From Swiss-Prot:
Modified residues (N6-carboxylysine): K124
Assembly and interaction partners: Homodimer.
Catalysed reactions, semicolon-separated: (2R)-2,3-dihydroxy-3-methylbutanoate = 3-methyl-2-oxobutanoate + H2O; (2R,3R)-2,3-dihydroxy-3-methylpentanoate = (S)-3-methyl-2-oxopentanoate + H2O
Originating species: Acinetobacter baylyi (strain ATCC 33305 / BD413 / ADP1)
Location of the active site: S517
Keywords from the named record: 2Fe-2S, Amino-acid biosynthesis, Branched-chain amino acid biosynthesis, Iron, Iron-sulfur, Lyase, Magnesium, Metal-binding
Cofactor binding note: Binds 1 [2Fe-2S] cluster per subunit. This cluster acts as a Lewis acid cofactor.
EC number of this enzyme: 4.2.1.9
UniProt name for this protein: Dihydroxy-acid dehydratase 1
Keyword DNA damage set for record: no
Lineage: Bacteria, Pseudomonadati, Pseudomonadota, Gammaproteobacteria, Moraxellales
Source taxon at top rank: Bacteria
SUPFAM superfamilies membership: IlvD/EDD N-terminal domain-like (SSF143975), LeuD/IlvD-like (SSF52016)
Underlying gene: ilvD1
């Protein structure tokens, strides 16, 4: 039976000094010997998805204390990708994921904590904490801050639901007046919480449910609803129970690596494909699996993507549907329920809250349960009042959305598409693969042949798009923006949004060794591996080259003969694999260190030593 890790610093005569310091934090005689639970918070006033978390850590701590544990809270950093977008701040976003993972490891191991509650929410925070949980392999429960309510704007006689991406698109569209743009800006992000569509933050919080590491509703109930408070209270109580099961009953089945097995990672990816989640989830699941020493690769993702239908379309794929609508339809447990009925899920895996995923679905899938409390939970609706306060309203929808033929969540027979929401493409530009969010691609351009317009940075591409230099039929190629080449693998939300603004969303493609925001849609292909900075063929593309994209057949190729490519490669080897044009980009020592040790997107951009 394993000893509590915390005994290292709380027991023995030679730990008198450490106990003295613990006492200075408020611990009493009776606390020594109880499990010490790290409350890993990520409160910051910089990020709307985290601005409401300040008091929630102490709420969880009180539940831990009441359940017989000792709670100790600390914070991680949190970068807002939307605020960091479109300038050099985005270079720091992906590297912050690894910094968060390291900081959690440092704090938990330095202080010998026994278990964790991870209070996350936005883009890199949930993945960073997930990587740490896999690395540490101590009992953990994830609970996130929850989605923002969708914005509402009265526009030209109609009211429509909007989000951050809508504000970005209209801002670059000259057909909108300044007053209309301001109305979108003021209405797009009305409350605290992670941006309201199926963007990266919400995608990852949904995937923690599929991995079995969070409670039902974690990915879908809005941040403002009083019922979300129940998740935080339950997390504090549950983590003490899990800690005691492991340390006092020798039950290792509740450890993260025992729950998040390869089958669980496949379930999570299956969910992501079915709901058209962010392409960034590919990076993060690969990275978390690497930390857990699980053999989960791009080949697994490719295999799954060929068999899983699209059962749910949410903004940006379907602009009038947001996370609040997914929750009304039964949330993630109901999407998983439909996948189970389609025999696309492994339900023997375990969770932190039920013995098996099958048990969880029997209790929480609104199609199979008859529990009135579950129905009421999923009727939790947005409040419609701008606020930065968590749990500040208790409005309810009058009915649930249980329509599986035409509703927000579909069954397999009535799927939005039989082909999945994400696809892995291979070809001579991407020998190790690349990713496209097919749920956001118009059917008319699933096959696309176009001529290359090559840019050595995101900034140069944006300038060309806004300068009306990009025409229908072009393939915008943005390179040297990968994990090493950026460094930091910037998101390309501005270029994709501006292509929409210019009316080119269905007439152009954008390919890059960088990545895309969960808010991106259109024929946007990212994560091209190997990247240009590693000698990838994307570094050999020239203006005017023909590029052939064939999503149904999972391919993307540069239509240039092998002899020409070999000659270009020889010339590039002599010059060095770096941008042709000098970029006005300050790369700090911190970013240089990241670039030295990161791997390709195909491996999750994890570190190598």
């Amino acid at each position: 039976m394993p000893d509590y890790r915390s005994k290292t610093s709380t027991h023995g005569r030679n730990m008198a000094g450490a106990r003295g310091l613990w006492r200075a934090t408020g611990m009493k005689d009776e606390d020594f010997g109880k499990p010490i639970i790290a409350v890993v918070n990520s409160f910051t006033q910089f990020v709307p998805g985290h601005v409401h978390l300040k008091d929630l850590g102490q709420m969880v701590a009180e539940q831990i204390q009441a359940a017989g544990g000792v709670a100790k809270e600390f914070n991680t950093i949190a970068v807002d990708d939307g605020i960091a977008m479109g300038h050099d701040g985005m270079l720091y976003s992906l590297p912050s994921r690894d910094l968060i993972a390291d900081s959690v490891e440092y704090m938990v191991n330095a202080h010998c904590a026994d278990a964790m509650v991870c209070i996350s929410n936005c883009d890199k925070i949930t993945p960073g904490m997930l990587m740490a949980a896999m690395r540490l392999n101590i009992p953990v429960v994830f609970v996130s801050g929850g989605p923002m309510e969708a914005g509402k704007v009265k526009f030209r006689g109609n009211e429509k639901a909007i989000d951050l991406v809508d504000a970005m698109v209209v801002a670059a569209d000259d057909s909108y007046t300044d007053e209309e743009v301001q109305a979108f800006e003021r209405s797009a992000c009305p409350t605290c919480g992670s941006c309201s569509g199926m963007f990266t933050a919400n995608s990852m919080n949904c995937l923690t449910e599929a991995l079995g590491l969070s409670l039902p509703g974690n990915g879908s109930i809005v941040a403002t609803h009083a019922n979300r408070k129940k998740l935080f209270l339950k997390a504090g109580e549950l983590i003490v129970s899990l800690a005691k099961r492991y340390y006092e009953q020798d039950d290792s089945s509740i450890l993260p690596r025992s729950i998040a097995t390869k089958a669980a990672y496949e379930n999570a990816m299956t969910l992501d494909i079915a709901m058209g989640g962010s392409t960034n989830t590919v990076l993060h699941l690969l990275a978390a699996a690497s930390e857990a020493e699980v053999d989960f690769t791009m080949d697994d993702i490719d295999r799954l993507s060929r068999n899983v239908p699209v059962l749910c379309k949410v903004a940006p794929a379907k602009q009038d549907v947001h996370m609040e609508d997914v929750h009304r339809a039964g949330g993630i447990m109901s999407i998983l329920g439909e996948l189970d009925r389609a025999k696309l899920l492994n339900t023997t895996v375990s969770t932190v809250h039920e013995k098996t995923l099958q048990d969880a679905l029997n209790k929480w899938d609104i199609i199979r349960t008859e529990d009135a409390d579950v129905y009421e939970f999923f009727r939790s609706s947005p409040g419609g009042v701008p606020t930065q306060v968590a749990f500040s309203q208790n409005r309810y929808y009058s009915t649930l959305d249980g329509d599986r033929e035409n509703g927000v969540i579909r069954n397999a027979e009535h799927a939005f598409s039989k082909d999945g929401g994400l696809a892995v493409l291979y070809g001579n530009i991407a020998l190790e693969g690349c990713i496209v969010k097919t749920a956001g691609v118009d059917e008319s351009i699933l096959k696309f042949n176009g001529t290359a317009r090559v840019f050595e940075s995101q900034d140069a591409a944006v300038e060309a798009i806004l300068g009306n230099e990009i025409k229908a039929g072009d393939v915008v190629v943005i390179r040297y923006e990968g994990p090493r080449g950026g460094p930091g693998m910037q998101e390309m939300l501005y270029p994709t949004s501006y292509l929409k603004s210019k009316g080119l969303g269905k007439d152009c493609a954008l390919i890059t060794d960088g990545r895309f925001s969960g808010g991106s849609s259109g024929l946007s292909i990212g994560h091209i591996s190997p990247e240009a900075a590693e000698g990838g063929a994307i570094g050999l593309v020239e203006d005017g080259d023909l590029i052939e994209i064939d999503i149904p057949n999972r391919s993307m190729n540069l239509k240039v003969d092998d002899e020409t490519l070999a000659a270009r490669r020889k010339a590039q080897d002599e010059k060095g694999w770096k941008p042709v044009e000098e970029r006005k980009r300050k790369v700090s020592k911190a970013l240089k260190v990241y670039a030295m040790h990161t791997t390709s997107a195909a491996k999750g951009a994890v570190r190598i030593l």
